[in-house]
A protein has these predicted regions:
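Acidic/proline-rich low-complexity IDRs
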Residues: 5-11, 61, 181, 524, ...
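Short amphipathic alpha-helical "recognition" segments used for binding
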Residues: 6-7, 333, 362, 428, ...
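C-terminal outer-membrane/trafficking sorting elements
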Residues: 667-746
Length: 746
């Protein structure tokens, strides 16, 4: 069955062009690995995931929030039911419904007892809280409840300190109905218990007022140099436990006891009526289960046993690096399972990095049994960090195949490696289908090429076979001649240090990202090379079809420089043509996709391409970093397929909407000031256009156009009495502006 998300991404034009581009997130192209169809092939990958639950769509069941701290990306997998069977389905645009201020961590839990899970995330030096104020009528909505949580540290009301690297336990520790917090002291040795005073003061749960109840909760200490846990510790503050206690200051530490990082999961593992904890440490791959010897909360009970090989009844947790555990039911059996993922950005496993332990016990007495080390990832295109897609018919069967390179994948022995995966198109001209053939194409990872190997494809010797020009970390290029027969792919030994027409080694300095493309439209492949520093170099082919000679013609093509907050940009170019017009989609390390036109007459030194959009399709938040693109009509329907690479190691797939026409609308119009009020709207909405009239399209949340209006310059009053409560997108066609409007008519 053809499956797709008919969801329009509306291009927010930054420069007031008369333009409209629409793409659909689309998961209809099947992808196979070892003869198994992937469930979420185009979900984009995951690296350092964190897991929570929320009823995202207000349908009465819990959906899965997956937050990745790589670049604070949010994914939502909605729980669906077909034929009585529950399963997850990715909602690719759900990230738009979460606060932009989310950083480093996300914990979703209902703190005020209204039945809707709220969000706890990072605030400067501590915790920020967003209250869920949504409903089935208006959808998911958030209100900032606390910019920063504070706690009473024995008379001093200070910010409740949680390091940005840590994941605290935010849970009802004493089972009184309000949410408490367990977090490590800044020294990293002692677990502090901050009790929520909402029930004690007001008899309800909707306040966030904390008091440091115990400076050494559980009576244990973690060694500052290892992750060894000392139970029944006899040093201050563990000897006295409950505050007040002068033995340790609330937010200070000695020079040799700087906190590096800890993760805490609190759960009543053995059903004893008190919280046990599972602890991870920044420098280690295991997690330690501590069993609480108490039988009632708030009795200063001690941890009486530890399991550093947890879960010792199954395959122990061993994931590099800095594991964090999450207690979530992900197989819909009513029992919460254990998910474990690394929490150390850029130095942890990033390809098979989510372990699932199935709970074969009960909800009250858990028993965790190892099931997989790639939960969700095993059903995605997933290649570590910094994926980049390439479409080319490598085997001359008339179907474009898919190659995916990466910046790096974690490797325990040598830390990291870069490689290219080959997905053969095993479908048809009208129904593409990709099958993973080789996750390390021609064994490139064994050749010590460094990070971020970047291929370009083209027939450089006019023999009818696609050759490869490979960009390396050291800035040079490597040539692979295609000597394939009809039955198999064979490439000649690599030619290192590929040269230009003068015999000089072509070099981008560092991290060359080449593209072979006939830029000047003379029938011969030219060479464009991205440089780490953010520019593009243009080498014109002054040779022949069979003997190319690349001459450096413009060292700063299009006057482009994508370095933004840092000196580096890592540009990844993708030039393409539609209706004989050349366009450029340019990826970069900042995660933005820049869309350029006016290219064909601007190849000379000093000429600039026209930047049509600095954040193409507004995808940067979902991409996070290391954006890249490949565009082609894969299924012969005259609609462009867009594949998007990103830092989480997977791909997005979108398909061009039939009502869009890339690049033909170029009329520049004056900047338009648009006012919409009141918001939220009630039974009417006033729209004021400052300069000119406009055409208005109104869409609902699932991308259906429900109304089309002509607006005049000046004031326009819209009657909304027949609108249902909810969120609508108001798209002003002439000015390319989109507004999100909440409507509440009752």
């Amino acid at each position: 069955m053809r499956r797709f998300f008919l969801i329009y991404l509306l291009l927010l034009i930054c420069f007031s062009f008369k333009a409209q581009f629409q793409f659909n997130f689309n998961d209809s192209i099947e992808v196979y690995r070892t003869n198994t169809a992937l469930k979420y092939p185009w979900a984009g990958g995951l690296n350092y995931a964190q897991f929570s639950e929320i009823d995202y769509d207000y349908d009465g069941d819990m959906d899965l929030i997956v937050f990745d701290r790589s670049n604070d990306q949010m994914r939502v997998f909605e729980q669906k039911i077909e034929g009585g069977v529950s399963f997850y389905k990715l909602n690719p645009l759900a990230y738009l419904e979460f606060p932009e201020q989310i950083r480093y961590r996300v914990i979703s839990i209902d703190y005020n007892g209204d039945g809707k899970n709220d969000l706890f995330t990072y605030g400067i030096g501590g915790i920020k809280v967003f209250k869920n104020v949504g409903s089935p009528q208006i959808g998911l909505q958030w209100e900032l409840a606390k910019d920063l949580l504070y706690s009473d540290y024995t008379g001093a009301n200070l910010n409740l300190y949680v390091s940005s690297s840590d994941i605290p336990a935010i849970v009802d520790v004493d089972f009184d109905g309000d949410i408490d917090i367990l977090t490590f002291h800044i020294s990293g040795e002692y677990l502090q218990y901050h009790q929520n005073q909402s029930q004690e003061l007001y008899g309800h749960s909707d306040s966030l007022i904390f008091k440091l109840k115990n400076e050494c909760w559980g009576g244990f200490r973690e060694d500052v140099n290892t992750n060894f846990l000392i139970l029944n510790d006899i040093t201050l503050p563990c000897t006295t436990g409950n505050v007040p206690n002068p033995g340790i200051k609330p937010n200070t530490s000695s020079v040799d006891k700087a906190h590096s990082g800890s993760t805490v999961l609190a759960l009543d593992y053995d059903g004893s009526g008190v919280m046990d904890v599972v602890i991870g440490d920044v420098a280690f791959s295991n997690m330690n289960l501590l069993i609480n010897g108490g039988t009632a909360p708030n009795t200063n009970s001690l941890m009486i046993s530890s399991d550093p090989a947890f879960p010792s009844n199954s395959t122990p947790i061993a994931i590099n690096l800095f594991p964090a555990a999450y207690f979530v039911d992900v197989d819909f059996d009513g029992k919460k399972d254990l998910l474990v993922a690394p929490n150390a950005k850029n130095v942890s496993e990033n390809e098979k990095s989510i372990c699932k332990y199935k709970n074969t016990g009960t909800q009250s007495t858990a028993n965790f049994v190892f099931e997989t080390k790639a939960f969700l990832q095993q059903d995605m295109i997933e290649h570590g960090t910094g994926s980049a897609p390439f479409l080319v018919d490598i085997d001359n069967d008339g179907l474009k195949d898919l190659f995916v390179s990466n910046f790096y994948a974690y490797k325990p022995t040598l830390n990291k490696e870069s490689r290219i995966a080959y997905y053969k198109n095993t479908g048809t001209l009208n129904n593409p289908k990709f099958t993973l053939i080789d996750s390390d194409f021609i064994n490139l990872s064994t050749l010590n090429y460094g990070f971020k190997i970047s291929p370009s494809f083209g027939d450089l010797d006019n023999d009818g076979k696609i050759d490869i020009l490979l960009g390396l970390e050291n800035g040079t290029l490597v040539f692979y001649k295609n000597n394939s027969s009809s039955s198999s792919l064979i490439f000649a030994p690599p030619v290192l240090n590929y040269t230009d027409n003068l015999g000089a080694v072509i070099s981008a300095g560092q991290y060359a990202t080449p593209q072979l493309f006939d830029l000047d439209n003379d029938g011969k492949l030219d060479l464009i090379v991205g440089k780490k520093t953010g520019e593009l170099m243009y080498y014109k082919n002054i040779g022949s079809l069979s003997t190319p000679q690349f001459q450096l013609t413009n060292p700063m093509l299009g006057n482009i420089d994508v370095s933004t907050l840092t000196p580096d940009g890592y540009p990844t170019p993708h030039f393409f043509r539609v209706q004989d017009t050349t366009y450029l989609l340019l990826g970069a390390s900042d995660g933005f996709i820049r869309f350029y036109d006016a290219i064909d007459n601007a190849l000379s030194i000093g000429n600039s391409f026209n930047l049509r959009d600095a954040d193409f399709l507004s995808l940067s938040k979902a991409i996070g970093g290391y954006s890249s693109c490949a565009v082609a009509d894969l299924d012969g329907d005259n609609k462009l397929n867009l594949f998007v690479g990103q830092d989480l190691g997977g791909l997005f797939h979108l398909e061009h909407d039939e009502n869009s026409n890339l690049g033909i609308h170029t009329e520049i119009i004056p900047t338009q000031n648009i006012e919409c009020f009141p918001v939220p709207a009630n039974k009417s909405l006033t729209i004021r256009l400052e300069l000119i009239g406009d055409k208005l399209f109104i869409y609902n949340l699932i991308g259906q156009k429900i109304d089309e209006l002509i607006l005049n310059q000046g004031t326009n009053d819209l009657d909304l009495q027949n609108y249902s409560n909810g969120i609508y997108f108001f798209q002003f066609i002439n000015t390319g502006i989109t507004r999100k409007i909440s409507v509440k008519t009752d």
